[in-house]
Amino acid sequence: MEKPILQYNNGVVAAKLDRTEKELVCGVSFHIFPGESLALIGETGSGKTLIAQSIMGVLPGNVSLVSGEISFCGNTLPKGKKLRSMLGREIVYIPQNGHEFLDPSRSIRRQLFDSIGKLGVAPSLRYAFACEKLAQVGFAQPEAILKQYPFQLSGGMAQRVTIALALCSEAKL
């Protein structure tokens, strides 16, 4: 039987406030199999981002995953440096606000080419590869997007560029 890429079992995320602990997310469980998509839906402040941050090991300083188990490809998700080394290669996070992720001083082309280069794609093929990824996320004229800088993009366009960057990583999650 096929293993889930990600299993999040009975996760509880809590914040330490003075000498007390306040549960922010309680008893969340889900799994994602290869080829599946999962949407975390909830009101503002309901903990969707905290769940994603707990998977990536980047919770704010006074917040932690206090119980539950997270596994990635059948193994307990590592912590610390080992987990950080997986981010961007095996696990990619697409932020709600693409402008926060993109470097405003570098063209979209440069940012995509950097990601594509990490895949080992030959320099002569990077332009076509970048255009293909931008087309996959709905840009009718990817060549024009490559020439732009993040500040020239709308919020939705910036988010689609971050999705294209994630597709360039060929991460599992």
Role assignments for model-derived ranges:
Residues 168-172:
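A short, proline-enriched helix->beta-strand linker immediately N-terminal to the Walker B motif
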Residues 148-153, 157:
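Conserved ABC ATPase signature
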Residues 97, 104-118, 129:
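Q-loop/switch helix immediately C-terminal to the Walker
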Residues 125-144:
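Conserved ABC ATPase "signature" region
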Residues 41-43:
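The feature captures the beta-strand-to-loop junction immediately N-terminal to the Walker
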Residues 64, 76-92, 118:
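ABC ATPase NBD coupling module
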